[in-house]
């Protein structure tokens, strides 16, 4: 019998073992506070009955609620999978482990494509990683714990009767299986590359499936469980200088920077994303670069292990399931030759413009129920076509004005989630592991944006007393605002200082003119809402103001700014951008697209601050105006 727990609010869900074989005990806990639960209620169900509705609570999304379309958003994140199928896969990898024990020491074998439509990384499926099983013994899942419900996937801890734990990652079905397939295939191969070639500590991946036809009945990744604490526990971005926690602050910067240094340490031979070479047998060979992923490999086991294929950077795939993949998406996904780094920007713009055109056509044909205004989509087309048009001229790739330009343009591995929240320090050895590589790609360092945990685009203050006139005479509220700006500036400066220590040839990538030149592309990559195309326009207009200076200094390719903006265009942009800022300020939870952490949501609902409407949506009750 397997028992599992569904916790409320914090949603730490557990499935535990019992002596009654053949049944699952489902435990639903209503928590009053994150990680604090009341006494659970227990329900029993048979292990082999995957369709028992009693266990559905274990798979439901519980970490937050949405003000709009809450029911639909939660249904999109329902991650029901076959526990019995997971059990079979675990037994299969232990059988493979026994076979791997016969392989020569140090031999690195290629991934094995199994008959059940899963793929095993047999190099990792060895006794030292998963333990041993006695002859005729079967592996049995004894406990399932839902330990994290993230933006893109659900994380389950899997305990077995061998006292060995695993992690099962199930992506939310927010996109079609083709998108998930590319993403999983590339992420697994990239983690394998980071482990075997770059020497980065990552969880060992044992098995994965890219669609729902495997025994788990969901796309999944089965990997090593690492017990420890997230590095984020030690990160305080608003720490006072000289605080007793200064060493922790410095260590976080160092640990994340060291990961970045290893990620960019090897120059690659193309732009795109990393896949296993033997993915070629099931795909179109034209998708992959034929030449070696990098030069100079002497280990025969690593030669031809990986290839560069289409980029899985999230911005290229986000909200594009309605496009014809082969005709409308594939031409813009790469891979791109290393001689054409700016094609990444150009194709990003062209793909987004194609996406907006298709959405308009679908809306006009009556085949789309989305509520997006046609004007917004038309403005997006103009913006993204402008981005594509300016792409070849954004950087003069032959300039001598930017030191080490060719180093900055070389393909290097980019991790989009380089963050203390994505790093765990294991309990025993106190070693840091980089966890999630979803969306990783190869692109020039000059186009790689700073990690979000230290990114800051506001006014820079390096010294409160010197930079702020009469700082000591300001009100406490004014001082707090400037102190916030100073600390954000300091964090970014410390990150860039560590970059210079680790990779001095790449430091000019954070020079203000270079940041400004790549800012339209970064705004496109980081866009979260429909209206944020305006931030791309804003970056382009800022470039327009300084283009002549950049041209005089040989930073850009064209002497004249490549885009035309009329006075009316600029006035309309200023008005629309102001409306966007007002919307962000006046609309509760706009920054999270209406999502609210569940404990906060329940408190607001119980207090009457949030009111449920007849259609199932919620509104935030505005405070009454004082007379």
Swiss-Prot record:
Keyword Mitochondrion tagged:
yes
Query: Which InterPro entries does the UniProt entry name for this protein?
Result: Kinase-like_dom_sf, Mito_inheritance_9
Look up the domain of life of the source: Eukaryota
For this UniProt record, the keywords arranged alphabetically read as follows:
Mitochondrion, Transit peptide
Where in the cell? Mitochondrion
Where in the sequence is the transit peptide found?
1-43
A Gene Ontology term for the protein's cellular component:
mitochondrion
Stated family: Belongs to the AIM9 family.
Protein name, entry field: Altered inheritance of mitochondria protein 9, mitochondrial
What is the phylogenetic placement of the source species in the record?
Eukaryota, Fungi, Dikarya, Ascomycota, Saccharomycotina
Gene label? AIM9
């Amino acid at each position: 019998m397997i028992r599992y727990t569904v916790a409320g609010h914090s949603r730490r869900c557990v499935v535990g073992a019992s002596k009654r074989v053949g049944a699952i005990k489902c435990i639903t806990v209503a928590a009053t506070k994150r990680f604090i639960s009341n006494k659970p209620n227990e329900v029993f169900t048979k292990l082999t009955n995957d369709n028992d509705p009693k266990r559905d609570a274990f798979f439901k999304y519980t970490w937050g609620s949405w003000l709009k379309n809450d029911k639909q958003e939660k249904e999109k994140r329902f991650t029901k999978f076959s526990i019995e199928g997971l059990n079979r896969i675990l037994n299969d990898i232990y059988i493979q482990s026994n076979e791997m024990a016969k392989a020569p020491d140090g031999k690195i074998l290629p991934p094995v494509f199994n008959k059940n439509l899963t793929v095993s990384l047999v190099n990792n499926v060895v006794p030292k990683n998963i333990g041993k099983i006695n002859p005729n013994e079967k592996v049995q899942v004894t406990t399932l714990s839902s330990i994290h419900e993230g933006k893109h996937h659900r994380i389950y801890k899997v305990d077995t009767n061998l006292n060995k734990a695993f992690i099962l990652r199930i992506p939310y079905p927010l996109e079609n299986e083709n998108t998930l397939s590319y993403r999983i295939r590339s992420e697994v191969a990239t983690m394998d590359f980071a482990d075997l070639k770059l020497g980065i500590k990552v969880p060992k991946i044992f098995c994965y499936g890219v669609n729902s036809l495997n025994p788990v009945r969901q796309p999944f990744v089965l990997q090593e469980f690492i017990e420890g604490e997230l590095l984020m526990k030690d990160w305080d971005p608003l720490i006072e200088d000289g605080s007793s926690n200064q060493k922790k602050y410095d260590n976080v910067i160092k640990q994340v920077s060291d990961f970045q240094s290893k990620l960019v340490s090897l120059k690659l031979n193309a732009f795109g994303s990393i896949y296993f070479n033997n993915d070629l047998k099931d795909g179109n060979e034209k998708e992959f670069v034929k030449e070696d992923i990098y030069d100079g490999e002497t280990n025969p086991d690593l030669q031809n292990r990986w290839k560069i294929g289409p980029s899985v950077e999230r911005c290229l795939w986000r909200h594009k399931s309605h496009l014809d993949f082969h005709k409308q998406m594939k031409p813009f996904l790469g891979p791109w030759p290393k001689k054409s780094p700016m094609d990444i920007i150009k194709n990003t713009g062209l793909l987004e413009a194609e996406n907006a055109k298709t959405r308009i056509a679908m809306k006009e044909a009556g085949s789309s129920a989305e509520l997006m205004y046609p004007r917004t989509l038309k403005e997006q087309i103009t913006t993204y076509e402008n981005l594509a048009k300016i792409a070849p001229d954004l950087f003069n790739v032959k300039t001598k004005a930017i030191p080490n330009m060719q180093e900055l343009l070389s393909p290097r591995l980019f991790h989009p989630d380089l963050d203390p929240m994505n790093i765990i320090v294991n309990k025993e050895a106190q070693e840091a592991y980089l966890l999630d590589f979803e969306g990783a790609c190869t692109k020039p360092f000059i186009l790689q944006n700073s990690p979000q945990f230290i990114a800051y685009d506001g006014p820079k203050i390096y010294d409160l007393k010197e930079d702020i006139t009469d700082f000591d005479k300001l009100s406490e509220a004014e001082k707090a605002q400037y102190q916030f700006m100073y600390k954000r500036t300091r964090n970014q400066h410390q990150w860039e200082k560590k970059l210079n220590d680790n990779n001095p040839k790449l430091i000019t990538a954070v020079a203000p003119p270079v940041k400004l030149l790549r800012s339209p592309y970064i705004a496109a990559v980081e866009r979260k809402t429909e209206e944020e195309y305006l931030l791309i326009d804003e970056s382009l207009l800022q470039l327009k103001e300084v283009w002549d200076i950049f041209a005089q200094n040989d930073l850009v390719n064209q002497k004249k700014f490549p885009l035309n903006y009329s006075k009316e265009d600029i006035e309309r942009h200023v008005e629309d951008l102001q409306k966007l800022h007002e919307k962000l300020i006046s609309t509760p939870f706009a920054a999270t697209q209406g999502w609210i952490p569940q404990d906060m949501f329940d408190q607001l609902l119980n207090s009457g601050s949030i009111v449920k409407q007849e259609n199932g949506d919620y509104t935030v009750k505005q405070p009454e105006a004082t007379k």
